[in-house]
């Protein structure tokens, strides 16, 4: 598996982070997991921190057990080992971050950024664009340059109102020097209503529908074609 020349390095592993909580990381992650699975790929999900709800969403979307990566509760060696062990037979490994990218228990210690650097994987930044347009440029620029050891490989915008809105956001990415990988349109059906979701049969059916809709959105506005940087070659299918 490889993404040579894609801007994501030689490994089809990356972390999905965000500037803040409630940016749409989980919705995008679920959609991407299912979209890649629907393409016949083995996708291994992970979650930063001890969260057990998001890992359940990941499993529903990917068909594989999602694994917690936590540098507060476990050693760096343990985190590296389980990341490698669970992803050994996968075509792509996707780590969903927690809170804002640099938010940890002591500055950025224990943060999603720390885990991305520990595993030496790039970050896809999800930005909530609900009430903003070109002003995302300095935000993206800041995330790109705040820590030179961390690679921000691209941006996906969430809560985009229209193609015209996306045009402003795409220009902001270009001026900040970070690739724009796509967007998800504003859609109330793509909002996870509560942390209880998925704990009952009825709620699981609702979650499955949300995953299906998110995957459709990701396929149409992020992946778009088989050669997209987020999609590694399918074994034997080139």
Can you describe what each PLM-predicted range is?
Residues 1-10, 227-238:
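Intrinsic disorder/low-complexity segments
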Residues 9-23, 27, 33-119, 127-154, ...:
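ATP-dependent carboxylate-amine ligase catalytic core
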Residues 21-23, 176, 230-233:
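Short conserved micro-motifs on helix faces and helix-strand junctions that flank
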Residues 28, 67, 101-104, 186, ...:
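Short, electropositive, low-hydrophobicity segments enriched in small/polar residues
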Residues 123-126, 181-183:
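Short hydrophobic alpha-helical runs that function as membrane-insertion/retention elements
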Residues 134-227:
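Internal gly/pro-rich beta-alpha loop/helix module
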